[in-house]
């Protein structure tokens, strides 16, 4: 299990360029991350998703620990695999390199309910 306090520092340093972390926060380059766990992929109201995310949601994909871990390590590859579209793209070009960083960010995201 990750360390939420460390994850918060990573999220604020790395994720906030494109995502808001606050409840009711605005849409930025990406959708807000508050309450992401259990959210059906591609469904945040008002955000214009790439088609791969919409297809994932239509297939019933939701964000959980395993999904976020794989996604944060390789966003584009994950969307391609889960959407079934080898040409699917993602605006999220950033990725986390270390498993510990991923675990810590996931632990932090769990605190945002």
UniProtKB/Swiss-Prot annotation:
Post-translational modification: Binds 1 heme c group covalently per subunit.
Coiled coil: none
Keyword Metal-binding: yes
GO annotation (BP), single: photosynthesis
Binding site for heme c: 15, 18-19, 92
GO MF annotation, one: heme binding
Keywords, comma-separated and alphabetical: Electron transport, Heme, Iron, Metal-binding, Photosynthesis, Transport
Superkingdom to which the source organism belongs: Bacteria
Family stated for the protein in its record: Belongs to the cytochrome c family.
Function: Cytochrome c2 is found mainly in purple, non-sulfur, photosynthetic bacteria where it functions as the electron donor to the oxidized bacteriochlorophyll in the photophosphorylation pathway. However, it may also have a role in the respiratory chain and is found in some non-photosynthetic bacteria.
Name of protein: Cytochrome c2
Taxonomic classification: Bacteria, Pseudomonadati, Pseudomonadota, Alphaproteobacteria, Rhodospirillales
